Amino acid sequence: MLTKEYRGVASINGPLVVVDGVTDVGFDEMVEVITPDKHKRRGRVLQVSKNRAVIQVFEGTSGLATETTRVKFLRHPMEIALSRDILGRVFNGVGEPIDGGGEVYSNKKYNINGNAINPYSRQYPRNYIQTGVSAIDGLITLIRGQKLPIFSGNGLPHNQLAAQIARQARLGDDNEDFAVVFVAMGIKHDDANFFINSFEKSGVLQNVVVFLNLADDPAVERIIAPRIGLTAAEYLAFEEGMHILVIMTDMTNYCEALRELSSRREEVPSRKGYPGYLYSDLASLYERAGMIKGERGSITQLPILTMPNDDITHPVPDLTGYITEGQIVLKRDLYQRGVYPPINILPSLSRLMKDGIGEGFTREDHPNVSSQLYAAYSRVQEVKSLASVIGEDELSSLDQTYLKFGRVFEKRFLSQGREENRTIEQTLDLAWEVLSELPPTELDRISGEELEKYYRGSVNDNG
């Protein structure tokens, strides 16, 4: 395929280069930017308007001159070579190996932009992915093919939780091929080292593909990294027949990079300076999760984002919530009280949970136990509000029982060690131990048969 080369550029602004007088140039086309000293830098076409092309340069524009810089259009979008050999490898944000293991060789390259799965071709998500974290497995169950974000805040242990899930995640059926694609955007070097060391020491790295975009890497790579990670996931899922969990952190850094580029392009800003197309851009990533009829594999997404000032109405968590199928919310107050992971279950939910738990999936009592835990913990918050007005000593004995239940629930069920991996059976058994702090008359969401079988106290106890 013939390439076109142009000498001289119209303007340079941050990571963007504008070239005038171009013909037959396509959106997302890859570009070689040749510096005056003959070094090559990569770029891609961001915008085409009549005979003008706007190009984002991956390695930045430092040292470029408008008159002597040459631009070569390569006539193809950004692509990545993929094979099953990517498992166990570590790449940078543009898909280059950084683990010393050499290039990945393949007869075929894949367009990183991919496509959202056709709704008609989608298969409804079923079955669950066990994370080993009781709060998630028991109350906000992650379903195969789902997209379930984690809403965190600065200083909360979302990195530790992400690494723990990546280490512990498995399917209910061990006979299925399962792997994790881990994409990090704009993270610090010590966080990157933490993730790699965590995967290596636990022995799971051989079943993980890692893409790392560091805080001092070009911002434009932050926009590319999740697309490369999802392309790798699509290859493993739909060509190799594997079930893939994609963990992406931190989506707020991704959106900040998008805002920076939008500002450079002098686009009209929307809420808090983010581009007006933020919703559709996020959807182009999140909608690449799912299952396809007739295909064996699946892609499940667990995007993680930090909410500025813990504001859940901020555009990034707000728009993410519209696209995804629930959310897991971390709470600063729980973390300050020593609860790890500090998951606030009341605003958290998994919209697909009901279709992947219960008899035939987890255990027959799971739906009712989950519902009862939510109801009881909600009552705990009401009792705490009352106690703050009249004092604990003035509470009824039943209300004091609920306060005790709340303390036990947070200490024994929500809290667990960072290396502790609980099976779904252990999680449900622990849920019954906690619920048994309440008299059976208060467990109105659980059937009599389940009470007889699992309740740890006396079923005849009326409190």
Curated annotation (Swiss-Prot):
Claim: Ion transport is one of the keywords in the record: yes
Entries under NCBIfam families matching the protein: PRK04196.1
Physiological role: Produces ATP from ADP in the presence of a proton gradient across the membrane. The V-type beta chain is a regulatory subunit.
Keywords associated with the record: ATP synthesis, Hydrogen ion transport, Ion transport, Transport
Gene expressing this chain: atpB
Domain of life: Bacteria
CDD domains in alphabetical order: ATP-synt_V_A-type_beta_C, ATP-synt_V_A-type_beta_N, V_A-ATPase_B
One function term, GO molecular function aspect: proton-transporting ATPase activity, rotational mechanism
Keyword check for Ion transport: yes
Name assigned to this protein: V-type ATP synthase beta chain
Similarity-based family: Belongs to the ATPase alpha/beta chains family.
Any GO CC annotation of this UniProt entry: proton-transporting ATP synthase complex
BP-aspect Gene Ontology terms: proton motive force-driven plasma membrane ATP synthesis
